[in-house]
């Protein structure tokens, strides 16, 4: 469909016309036009503005209001889709909630990111299995649609700029409306999208952004959340600017230097051709300039793009690797008419990454075995709406066990996950959601590639997951088209797919690296037949286990944590890694999964509401298998022994005791008596069978003949106290940062009580707030948004987010009968990143009628939409009484008579006892104060004369037209009353 740029490009809108055009929505009630700041500005004049024309990318996460809509009933969906509401009938006429004066006091206040699904109660409905038993979908229309509303200002200084609103992701069908103007829709729950709202933004005034999100449909078979669960941005640029994701740095590393091939795409959204050049500067990790280049000037037609290609050589580059995360920055300046009109920054890394069929992945020429995990994007207490700090927390937990790579199963990740991986040294196998060559599928994949191509952590593109068509000739056509997109917009990374039941056949031949899911024996056969093709385990293991549980109990939904427990006969952790690590040609693989996740409960369904595949539970508490991987994926000494040693009623019965370790030998002691030492074989564990007796089990680990580590489990006493630990010593007071507060239940001697389920309540004071709770129990149906949670296997967690004011955050954990615990961290005042200010209506305070007032519908009489329009039901009366004088404004009271939200001043306002009178716009208001309300009569000076009933005319037939041929429709025209009763009530916003 044609866009504004297409019109400009076609020359249908001349520059002179643009310069002269003005947006003038006429207000019949106030008989006034919008201020001149709303005029479109000739962007030839803008270039001379210099610094005022700079790019701004402002976070639009704070200060939203939210309300559920309805997928089936327009009356519960603010009239959307109803026959009487013409949302699409007239431009700029989209539903009352778009009015600034609209009363949203019953809407919930919140900040983004937001996932409303995790706030819902669980439902035991088999159809909800993959949604984690949250009520979403066609059967649950009342909880499947949400409306978001945000009021914000755009400065008058932004006149002439290009204004866009960017969404990093919303689940799933999103409709965007600005100032009553329908902007557009987006389908898909994971890829970013944006809208150019330049023509619809009110410059120098307040704006109302309305977003409807419909989560009825599903993309996946796992929990996906609902709502605007990623960041939203307001972006302001010159009409001549770097295109979104319009820079790409491709590096070629040679001895002592790196040659950077730089692509810059510049867009001209103005109405006239522009001559522009690009200045590129490369900054090293310390911020020093190490290379510069200026392109020749090139003419860019109106509505067109221009690509600039430059070469910069960096001497003695610092290469990005897993151990040394050196990040460079490309600073791009667009220059026109002697002024810099746009400045765009691109972080990137210099490194090489290639696959060798015999050595696997080579990073900077060094073989790196992929010790990877697949991960979905939800977390305890949060659902799918993860603050940035939680991305870093999750990457850190994976790195603790030696994981060096993540597969973003099964969708494009949030950009902040890639930032975390760039900065912390983690590789990314970047996956799209839809394997398709239809326009939507290719667009999603192109967005993924363009957005993520400068991240050094991204080493390969994934074109899909377990697609049955991939192994067919038709799949080959689809994958070929997708591969062409990757080559066009990147070309520096290979492509692959996580296939189902096949390796490298049919359409899978399109893959540069042969991926396979679970088929270890077939992978070996494939390598023998195709020794020149790199091979990688795109999905492996699928072992299951419940943290802290060692006896499988189907009724309770728990699975033993001993490693052999898998689903569908797939490999154990130890079985897969021993196979993988013994084959240098096998590039490594990605374990299913790093973290437990909601939905797809495995191996059991209700009461389970989450999977148990994770090596780590939903909170981030490690399971026992974590220490197997840590033993063989890291160089640090590891010794971990399990199970716990609290087994009342099991005296004299045999219990398997396992130890995970990478030491030379481990000796086991039971109640002080040695059961012998065992040698540790590579990539394996050691085990003993022990007859249970209360007391202790102790493992002693030896390396090079020396005792270097011990690990001990003891039979504990009853739960006596709580211990509270924060994962960080301090946070930034930016309203975004998050700290995990882990609660451990201990006995009187300070030992973790592993079989307790005490209810723990969190209280937060100071410069923070509680945003979620969790415990890793896959069967727990308590709300993640409550203030308390039961301990599970001795642990639970509270997630605390900072406020925007510096100070201390104090968290207290209490439980009946146990000693409480508290912890304090500092929230350091910081400079906030650029963001859109939160708009709040001023509430005047004072005597008499001073305050905010809104109309209410009459309790008797024709209380319908027509009357609502007449009285201006969404109006706001800001009244200020000083003695007998009444001043203030009336906003949005034009009602049926047209107009917008520009406040009209109150003039000639008086208060005499209980009587009030004032004028505003074209209306006179008179009435009396009655307890908690003001009863007024509104007299309107109409710009037209109301029709009068037809007169009796001699000779006019009872049926048929008048003899003079006059129009009889005047007989049924609405007669607008000249005086309307208006009742006001006092409000807080």
Explain the meaning of each model-derived region:
Residues 1-15:
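N-terminal secretory signal peptides and thylakoid transit peptides that target proteins
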Residues 50, 119-123, 138-245, 270, ...:
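Accessory beta-strand-rich segments of carbohydrate-active enzymes
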Residues 26-166, 219, 225-228, 240, ...:
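Extended carbohydrate-recognition surfaces in non-catalytic/accessory domains of CAZymes
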Residues 849-876, 889, 905-989:
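Beta-sheet ligand-binding and adhesion/scaffold domains
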Residues 259-297, 656-673, 697-701, 810:
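Beta-strand-rich binding/interaction modules
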Residues 262-265, 643, 657-661, 700, ...:
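Beta-strand-rich structural segments
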Residues 56, 62, 78, 83-96, ...:
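Extended substrate-binding grooves/exosites of carbohydrate-active enzymes
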Residues 52-60, 99, 839-856, 880-883:
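N-terminal helix-cap/turn-to-beta initiation motif at the start of protein domains
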């Amino acid at each position: 469909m044609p866009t504004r740029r297409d019109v400009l490009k076609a020359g249908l809108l001349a520059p002179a016309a643009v310069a002269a055009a003005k947006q003038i929505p006429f207000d019949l009630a106030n008989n006034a036009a919008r201020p001149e700041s709303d005029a479109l500005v000739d962007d030839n004049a803008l270039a001379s503005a210099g610094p005022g024309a700079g790019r701004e990318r402002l976070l639009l996460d704070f200060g939203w209001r939210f309300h559920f809509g309805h997928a089936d009933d327009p009356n519960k969906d603010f009239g959307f889709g109803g026959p009487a509401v013409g949302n699409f009938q007239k431009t700029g006429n989209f539903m009352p909630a778009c009015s600034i004066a609209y009363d949203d006091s019953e809407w919930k206040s919140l900040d983004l990111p937001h996932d409303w699904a995790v706030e819902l109660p669980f439902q035991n409905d088999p159809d909800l299995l993959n949604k984690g038993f949250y009520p979403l979908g066609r059967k649950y229309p009342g909880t499947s649609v949400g409306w978001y509303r945000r009021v914000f200002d755009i400065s008058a200084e932004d006149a002439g700029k290009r204004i866009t609103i960017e969404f990093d992701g919303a689940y799933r069908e999103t409709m965007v409306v600005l100032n009553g103007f329908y902007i557009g829709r987006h389908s898909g729950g994971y890829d970013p999208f944006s809208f150019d709202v330049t023509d619809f933004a009110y410059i120098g005034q307040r704006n109302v952004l309305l977003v409807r999100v419909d989560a009825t449909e599903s993309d996946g078979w796992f929990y996906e959340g609902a709502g605007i669960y990623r960041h939203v941005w307001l972006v302001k640029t010159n009409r001549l600017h770097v295109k979104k994701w319009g820079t790409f740095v491709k590096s070629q590393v040679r001895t002592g230097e790196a040659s950077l091939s730089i692509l810059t795409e510049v867009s001209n959204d103005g109405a006239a051709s522009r001559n522009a050049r690009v200045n590129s500067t490369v900054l090293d990790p310390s911020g020093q300039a190490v290379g510069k280049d200026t392109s020749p000037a090139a003419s860019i037609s109106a509505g067109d793009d221009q690509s600039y290609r430059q070469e910069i050589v960096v001497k003695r580059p610092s290469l990005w690797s897993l151990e040394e995360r050196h990040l460079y920055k490309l600073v791009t300046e667009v220059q026109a008419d002697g002024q810099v009109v746009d400045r765009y920054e691109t972080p990137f890394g210099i490194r090489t990454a290639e696959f060798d069929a015999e050595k696997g992945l080579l990073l900077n020429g060094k073989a790196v075995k992929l010790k990877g995990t697949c991960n979905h994007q939800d977390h305890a207490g949060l659902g799918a709406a993860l603050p940035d700090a939680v991305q870093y927390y999750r990457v850190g937990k994976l790195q603790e066990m030696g994981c060096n790579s993540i597969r973003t199963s099964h969708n494009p990740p949030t950009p902040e996950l890639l930032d975390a991986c760039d900065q912390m040294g983690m590789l990314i196998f970047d996956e799209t959601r839809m394997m398709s060559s239809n326009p939507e599928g290719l667009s999603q994949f192109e967005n993924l590639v363009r957005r993520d191509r400068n991240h050094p952590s991204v080493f390969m593109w994934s074109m899909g997951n377990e697609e049955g068509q991939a192994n067919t000739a038709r799949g080959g056509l689809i994958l070929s088209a997708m591969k062409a997109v990757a080559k066009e917009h990147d070309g520096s990374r290979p492509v692959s797919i996580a296939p189902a039941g096949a390796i490298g056949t049919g359409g899978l031949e399109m893959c540069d690296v042969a991926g396979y899911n679970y088929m270890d024996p077939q992978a070996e056969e494939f390598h023998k037949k195709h020794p020149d093709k790199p091979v990688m385990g795109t999905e492996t293991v699928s072992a299951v286990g419940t943290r802290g549980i060692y006896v499988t109990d189907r009724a309770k939904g728990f699975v033993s944590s001993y490693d052999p427990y898998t689903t569908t006969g797939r490999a154990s952790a130890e079985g897969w890694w021993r196979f993988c690590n013994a084959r240098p040609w096998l590039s490594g693989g990605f374990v299913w999964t790093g973290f437990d996740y909601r939905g797809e409960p495995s191996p059991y369904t209700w009461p389970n509401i989450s999977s148990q595949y994770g090596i780590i539970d939903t909170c981030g508490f490690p399971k026992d298998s974590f220490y197997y991987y840590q033993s063989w994926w890291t160089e640090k000494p590891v010794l971990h022994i399990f199970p716990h040693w609290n087994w009342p009623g099991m005296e004299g019965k045999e219990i398997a005791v396992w130890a995970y370790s990478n030491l030379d030998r481990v000796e086991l002691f039971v109640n002080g008596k040695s059961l012998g030492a065992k040698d540790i074989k590579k990539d394996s564990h050691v085990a003993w069978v022990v007859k249970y007796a209360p007391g202790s089990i102790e493992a002693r680990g030896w390396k090079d003949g020396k005792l270097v580590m011990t690990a001990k489990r003891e039979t504990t006493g009853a739960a006596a106290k709580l211990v509270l630990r924060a994962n960080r010593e301090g946070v930034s007071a930016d309203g975004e940062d998050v700290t995990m507060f882990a609660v451990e239940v201990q006995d009187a001697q300070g030992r973790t009580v592993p079989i307790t389920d005490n209810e723990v309540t969190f209280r937060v004071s100071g410069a923070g707030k509680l945003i979620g709770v969790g415990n890793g129990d896959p069967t727990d149906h308590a709300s993640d948004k409550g203030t308390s949670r039961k301990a599970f296997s001795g642990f639970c967690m509270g997630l605390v987010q900072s406020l925007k004011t510096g100070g201390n955050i104090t968290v207290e954990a209490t439980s009946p009968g146990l000693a409480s615990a508290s912890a304090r961290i500092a929230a350091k005042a910081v400079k906030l990143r650029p963001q859109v200010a939160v708009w709040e209506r001023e509430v005047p305070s004072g005597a008499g009628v001073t305050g905010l007032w809104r109309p209410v519908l009459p309790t008797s009489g024709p209380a319908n939409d027509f009357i609502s329009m007449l009285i201006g039901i969404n109006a706001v009366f800001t009244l200020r009484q000083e003695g007998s004088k009444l001043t203030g404004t009336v906003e949005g009271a034009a009602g049926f008579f047209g107009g917008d939200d520009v406040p009209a001043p109150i003039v000639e306002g008086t208060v005499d006892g209980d009587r009030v009178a004032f004028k505003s716009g074209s209306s006179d208001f008179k009435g009396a104060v009655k307890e908690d309300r003001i009863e007024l009569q509104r007299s309107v000076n109409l710009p037209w004369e109301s029709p009068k009933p037809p007169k009796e005319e001699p000779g006019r037939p009872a049926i048929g037209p008048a003899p003079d041929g006059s129009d009889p429709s005047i007989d049924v025209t609405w007669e607008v009353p000249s005086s309307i009763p208006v009742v006001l009530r006092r409000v807080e916003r």
